[in-house]
């Protein structure tokens, strides 16, 4: 694994990570992490994918991890999407002709969907883990608060993520809870408002998506409700598959060993079915 940086169009410092295979890559996979976390939480998954001869890369979204920006605050969700596309285009230029896959978790899946819809010829396929596409699953009081306060008082708090919602593996819950690069503060209304706008946009554009998509989803997910995954499957017109994990929580790559192994196998199969 190696690290580097890039500067986005706003000249913000973006912390980047790369997991390179020994040989010339068979595919490129960009990992788009979720809200409040960072690319380092995908080290194990990225290393496993890289061992298959795939170049994996990622970055900390602005306002996350080691990247610049006010923590968990964004004035335009589209900046997340823009930065991902910038990073992918940069790496793809070094490996022309190598297929590119998006792997997005939660909010990172929302970013991935928007990136793929805006750039249909850039990506070969997507893998969405616990995709955040269903704002209806958010408690109604928090939903109204985010909408009303997002513009008027963007720094007001509207809720907080519960560490226990991450995984059934309590060791993983502990690691999440005490990770200094994870944002443990309450979610701000301005950030929540932008995320809600993005999820609403995603629901509208799902029928237009033509990028083949694999969805991995747990049934005991309090953050990205399983109904969002079913909504995508019902309304999308692209080649799509879904794998449901009974009882699994939000971070499938941090779940029980059985789930983690299955997730890795599903990702491997999905990618290599599309790599010549």
Swiss-Prot record:
This is Monoglyceride lipase homolog. It comes from the Viruses. Belongs to the orthopoxvirus OPG043 family. The lineage of its organism: Viruses, Varidnaviria, Bamfordvirae, Nucleocytoviricota, Pokkesviricetes. The gene is OPG043. It comes from Monkeypox virus. Pfam families: Hydrolase_4.
């Amino acid at each position: 694994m190696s690290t580097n940086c890039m500067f986005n169009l706003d000249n913000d410092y973006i912390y980047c990570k790369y997991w390179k295979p020994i040989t010339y890559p068979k595919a490129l996979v960009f990992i788009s992490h979720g809200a409040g976390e960072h690319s380092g939480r995908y080290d194990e998954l990225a290393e496993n994918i890289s061992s298959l001869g795939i170049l994996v890369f990622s970055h900390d979204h602005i306002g996350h991890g080691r990247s610049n920006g006010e923590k968990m605050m964004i004035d335009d969700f589209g900046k997340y999407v823009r930065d991902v596309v910038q990073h992918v285009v940069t790496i793809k230029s070094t490996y022309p002709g190598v297929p590119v896959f998006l792997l997005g978790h939660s909010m990172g899946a929302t970013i991935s969907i928007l990136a793929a819809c805006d750039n249909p010829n850039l990506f070969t396929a997507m893998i969405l883990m616990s995709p955040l596409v269903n704002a209806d699953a958010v408690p109604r009081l928090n939903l109204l608060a985010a909408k009303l306060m997002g513009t008027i008082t963007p720094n007001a708090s509207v809720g907080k993520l519960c560490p226990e919602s991450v995984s059934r593996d309590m060791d993983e819950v502990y690691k999440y809870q005490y990770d200094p690069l994870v944002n443990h503060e309450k979610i701000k209304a301005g950030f929540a408002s932008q995320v809600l706008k993005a999820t609403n946009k995603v629901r509208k554009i799902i029928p237009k998506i033509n990028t083949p998509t694999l969805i991995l989803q747990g049934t005991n997910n309090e953050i990205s409700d399983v109904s969002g995954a079913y909504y995508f499957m019902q309304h999308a017109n692209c080649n799509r598959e879904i794998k449901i994990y009974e009882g699994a929580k939000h971070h499938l790559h941090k779940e029980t060993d059985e789930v983690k192994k299955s997730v890795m196998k599903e990702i491997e199969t999905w990618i290599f079915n599309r790599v010549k």
